[in-house]
Amino acid sequence: MWIKELNLTHYRNYQQASAAFSPGLNVFIGDNAQGKTNFLEAIYFLSVTRSHRTKSDKDLIYFDERDCSISGTLERLSGRVQLEILLSDKGRITKINTLKQAKLSDYIGAMMVVLFAPEDLQLVKGSPSLRRKFMDIDLGQIKPVYLSDLSHYNHVLKQRNAYLKSVHQLDSDFLSVLDEQLVTYGSRVMAHRLAFVQSLAKEANKHHQAISNGLEKLSISYQASVSFEHQQEIYQQFMDQLKTTHQRDFLRKNTGVGPHRDDLIFYINGMNANFASQGQHRSLILSLKMAEVSLMKQLTGDNPILLLDDVMSELDNIRQTKLLEAVKKENVQTFITTTSLKHLSQLPKDISLFKVNKGTIALDSVMID
């Protein structure tokens, strides 16, 4: 798939903007604070209905306006698709081919993206919530049913925690009813995550070995808060562990086990990547991002769109070359933001170059090798 055009109204610093893209490489160039990342963020938001930079939709609306819209035309293997998101103080509306989508799981997945931004370099050493978010975003695009299971799980978890905080004496029978619902959805979430991480680890290691010239092996371990050896055991193990922590949960007023406590651990040559060098971290994240691209292609049969937000300047020449080689091999539509082409000496010549300046975007040139 590839996005053919994007239209913004009252989005960030764009009062009105439109751009048509090539199915290959698209580069946004401009000084800092002109709107390059905002434009890339809009593509990302149109896909996953969330920003990678803010939790508040209000931050996305142009100064002194009450609403904004993002719309785009997507070319998929199955045909052309029109996507639109409307944001206002009343909430948000998502549309596919002008039809409102009642649930996020009905919308997300229509356009798949993989984002590589500077903050992704914190994925290994950052909080576990970052790694859970990483799994959620990928799985949500690949498997819509995952979002449904996760949404139901979070709803029951909120109910359970609210109950624990509100009572002075535990009603085990009532808690068991909540446990049953929590385990039903939670075990599905963990099963999805386990299968995803196992597949992702294989792809990531392939890319990492290519980047390291065969010197390093990358492995990823899914650290579920529920102990189990086989996928078939997840439901029963989760139920058993939840029952044994009733008193603990009552005293602490929260739920101590479940997928909301999951984590990932990365290893390079068997050593925890927390202790890896800065260069190794960059190689690891680069491998992970290209593995996301490969896996989405494998599991859905269509290409995701790759968004590279000012990351080329974070990579040395060798890693830049490896990244661009991988992009060329995967043959996916790619967007790159940069302040200068000097960081992009390894770029192929067949690119569409857009100049971004003070909330305007214009095609500067199409260079063909």
UniProtKB/Swiss-Prot annotation:
Keywords: ATP-binding, Cytoplasm, DNA damage, DNA repair, DNA replication, DNA-binding, Nucleotide-binding, SOS response. It is found in: Cytoplasm. Disulfide bonds: none annotated. ATP binds at residues 30-37. GO terms for biological process: DNA replication; DNA synthesis involved in DNA repair; double-strand break repair; SOS response. GO terms for molecular function: ATP binding; single-stranded DNA binding. Transmembrane segments: none annotated. One of its GO terms (cellular component) is cytoplasm. Belongs to the RecF family. The RecF protein is involved in DNA metabolism; it is required for DNA replication and normal SOS inducibility. RecF binds preferentially to single-stranded, linear DNA. It also seems to bind ATP. This is DNA replication and repair protein RecF. It comes from Streptococcus equi subsp. zooepidemicus (strain MGCS10565). The lineage of its organism: Bacteria, Bacillati, Bacillota, Bacilli, Lactobacillales. The gene is recF.
